[in-house]
UniProtKB/Swiss-Prot annotation:
Name of the protein in its database record: Large ribosomal subunit protein uL23
Record has rRNA-binding as a keyword: yes
A GO cellular component annotation in the UniProt record: ribonucleoprotein complex
Family stated for the protein in its record: Belongs to the universal ribosomal protein uL23 family.
Alphabetically ordered keywords of this record: Ribonucleoprotein, Ribosomal protein, RNA-binding, rRNA-binding
Protein's GO biological process: translation
InterPro entries the record matches: Nucleotide-bd_a/b_plait_sf, Ribosomal_uL23-like, Ribosomal_uL23/eL15/eS24_sf, Ribosomal_uL23_CS
Pfam family, one: Ribosomal_L23
Gene3D superfamilies: 3.30.70.330
Description of how the protein assembles with itself and partners: Part of the 50S ribosomal subunit. Contacts protein L29, and trigger factor when it is bound to the ribosome.
Annotated source species: Pseudothermotoga lettingae (strain ATCC BAA-301 / DSM 14385 / NBRC 107922 / TMO) (Thermotoga lettingae)
Free-text function comment from the UniProt entry: One of the early assembly proteins it binds 23S rRNA. One of the proteins that surrounds the polypeptide exit tunnel on the outside of the ribosome. Forms the main docking site for trigger factor binding to the ribosome.
Gene transcribed to yield this protein: rplW
Length: 100
């Protein structure tokens, strides 16, 4: 899929909900799994348009594949991209606040 043809729904795959990310939400930081072809500008535009918030900054990192085994078959998990989105003061994503 070409980078220009990604819609906002293609960019944000799912929110990452862990104990650490729940604590980061108090600091206005939200963590998403994003498309591997996306960049900081695309993630910022997608979050701002889908959740009606203002984004202060976006940090992106690639998560390396981990080795996995299923019996005698060996393989690796897929690599994926993680985005930490920091919102401007006074903004929260209400859709994700109730998630446990």
């Amino acid at each position: 899929m070409n980078q220009q043809k990604l819609t906002h729904y293609d960019i944000l795959i799912k929110p990452i909900t862990t104990e650490k990310t729940m604590l980061d939400r108090e600091k206005r930081k939200y963590v998403f799994e994003v498309n591997v072809l996306s960049n900081k500008a695309l993630v910022k535009n997608a979050v701002e348009s889908l959740f009606n918030v203002k984004v202060e900054k976006v940090n992106i990192s690639l998560v390396k594949p981990k080795p996995k085994r299923r019996g005698r078959f060996e393989g690796k998990t897929r690599r994926w991209k993680k985005a930490v989105v920091t919102l401007k003061e006074g903004y929260t994503i209400k859709e994700l606040e109730g998630q446990q």
